[in-house]
Structures are given as structure tokens and as C-alpha cells.
């Protein structure tokens, strides 16, 4: 009793005082063992540790009830949570339900990392911009070296191909674009305004700095503008045909019908264009065109639209001369020698469709242009206006749905079957069997191809059947039906 009371006093002292180790004064026996106590609300066990063997023993178990008098009582651990161990008398599933595991914050950390990766830091943005400008200048340096070789060949009397000539002109234009940037290098502290200048004027950079996605976006925007211009130019041609009906006669009506066919999707041929071009040789010259038509042609050829009418005509004449020279070079080398990108650029420079077509269609367009321009000698202004017929919107039009909830009226005529109102269809044949004998039912009548007609004619009342006569007629018909069934059963 004294020993257990001593242990209880020590336990109270441990909980009351902040000291973790309590050493007894009496040590008459060998201090080779230590008494370990875990004051836990869930797991309250007292263990005994042997320093020599380093083994733990539980005095609560049988066989360990005798304690060595030289033991030391030490508080080694104080916990406030439940030990995830098997407790005798309780299954493991109950412990799991009582103390659920807390979810680790790894999922939230991963989502946070994904969000951070989506939002680039300032350092990453700066590195991307530096790589972008480095690649642009590197490509420009390569073009400069190739252009130097081409110039050396020209100085030695060699002839360049169309592809090489276009590349040489492009590199020269790119170097001239770098001239305005020299001002930012000469003026002190003006280089800090370079980002603002590039943001406001992105086209001032050379062509090597332009990405493919930006090129596609520009081409799509220009294509949408050309479709609108094509509609405007088609309307101008129809108006000209209406004004000159007296001179042209039947040709004006043919032209108007032909324009409608083209607008619905008909593809114009070279013969038809040549036939109708003779009607506009004088009127569609650049000298006779108004300002709206000149502006539309300049936009079609991707030229500047500011200036007087004479300036616009001069721009168009110079552009048409360069196109004719390019056509002669293409005719010498052949259309088949051009790549897809070169075909698209050539069609775009001539005001034709360049997007949404296959390679064969692009080649066919270019060959038709050359036939009309070089062989048929069609005027250039009329040739440009004829190209507007090829700028047809390929996208299908949406189906127009009426705003009201009424269904659209259809013109389909439903033919209902017509029945011939004959006496045979209207007469009940049951009264005919009333006076026949049973023997007549046994012998079947001979089969003939002619239709069966009743032996005795039956006449219907001429007047309408009244309500008083209806029950008598129904009773007669029922009686005749019963007699016929009885006679058939007797047979």
C-alpha cells in the first residue's frame, strides 16, 4: 500500500510541476533499471527499462508485477493524441472511424504550383523577349550573308532567279527598316523609349521578327476586307451596264444575268470574261474611274489609299507594270516551279483569293491570270475587276429561321386516295342470302374472271334515311346475319 501511494504522489508531482524527471532519494539497490511512465489519457502504461539489456517491460502484464526497489521513475514522453496502434479489445476499424486521417496538403500545393506556372514571372517574360529579339537578329544576319553572295553574283554577270531576287529585295527592305532605330542609339537615354515605340509601331521591325501566327491573322483580316471590296466592285460593274443599256442592247441583260450566276457560286471562265471585257474597254480605264473605285482597287492590291486621284492612278499603273514583269518571269520559269507560299503570295498580289484553296486551285488561278494578261491582252484595270468574281465567300450561309412560331408553308400537294362511290360498295350483301337453301352453300359456284354481280338488283331509297327507319333497317340486317350463320353451321 505504501508503495502504490508513493507512486500516486509522484504522478501528481509530475503533473503539477514542470520538471520532467523525478529521481527518488532512496537508492539502496542497483540503479540498473528505470521506471518509465507515459501519462496519456488514451494510453496509460508504466514500463520498466533495463539500462544494461535495453529492454522494456510492462508491470501490468502477468509475470512483471514484482518491481525492483532500485528503479528510477522517469517521465520520457507526454502526448495529447491517440497512438495509432492496436488496442486490445477494440478492432482497428473503430479507431480509424473515431480518428480519421487528415488529408495532406499536397493536392493544394500542386494546384498552386500549376497556377504559378500559368502566370509567368517578370523574369520569365524578360527572358522570352530577349530570346525573341535574339532569334530575329540572328535570322537577319543569315539573310544578310546570303544577300551578299547574291550581290557578288550580280556583279559578275550572273542572272538570279525569281525566288533569289525576291529574297534580295526583302533583305534590303529589312535593313532600311533599321535606319529609324539609329536615332534611339544616338540620342542619350532614348533607348528606354524603344519598348513604347515598338508597341505603337510593330511593323517597323524587319520581317524576320514576325511570327507565323501574326502573318496568318493579317492575311485573314485582309481577306475579309477584299471580300467586301469585291461586292462593291461587282455592283459598280452592274451599274455601268445599266447606264449603257441603249448602246449594249441585249449584252447588258446577259451581263446582269451572268453576274447573278457568279454571285450564286458559278465559276467564270476565260472566254466569258474576254467576251464581256469588250463592253468595258473604254469605261474601265484608269482615267475614267472615280475616286471610290480607285480606292477600292488600291485596297485590293494592298496599296496606300491617301492622296489625290492622280496619285492613286500612278500607284496603280506602277503596280500593274511590276505585276506584268513578274508574270513574264513566271511564264518563263513555269507555274509548277513555285511553292505553296509563293503561289499564295502571287495570288494575293494580284487581288485573288489565297486562303481556303488547294495547291491545284492556286495554280489554276495563276494560269488563268497569265492567259488573260499575256495572251488575250485584257486591260489591267478590267483584269483586276474580273478577279473580283473569284472572291466569292466560300462559307455556307446559315438557314433563315422565321421569327414567328408558325411552321413554314410547304407547297407539297398530298394526293388523297379517291374512292368510287358505286352501289356495290355501299350495299350490304346479307339480305341476298336470306332466301337461299343449305344445298346452295355446299356447291361452290364456278370461278369466272368477270366480277360477281348479284342476281336480284337491290335498290336504295332515294330520299334520306330518317331516324324512325334506322332501327328497322338495323334489325333486318341482324336477322339476316343470324340466319346466314345458322345455315352455314347446318351445312
UniProtKB/Swiss-Prot annotation:
Targeting signal (transit peptide) range: 1-25
Record's compositionally biased regions (Polar residues): 94-109, 465-491
Any one biological process term the GO annotation gives: mitochondrial calcium ion transmembrane transport
Alphabetical UniProt keywords: Coiled coil, Membrane, Mitochondrion, Mitochondrion inner membrane, Transit peptide, Transmembrane, Transmembrane helix
Record region (Disordered): 94-115, 435-491
Mitochondrial intermembrane topological domain residue ranges: 26-177
A Pfam family hit: LETM1_RBD
Compositional bias of kind Low complexity: 449-461
Membrane topology: Single-pass membrane protein
GO cellular component: mitochondrial inner membrane; mitochondrion
Mitochondrial matrix side: 199-491
Transmembrane region(s): 178-198
GO molecular function: ribosome binding; transmembrane transporter activity
UniProt-recorded name of the protein: LETM1 domain-containing protein LETM2, mitochondrial
Organism the protein comes from: Homo sapiens (Human)
Organism placement in taxonomy: Eukaryota, Metazoa, Chordata, Craniata, Vertebrata
Gene: LETM2
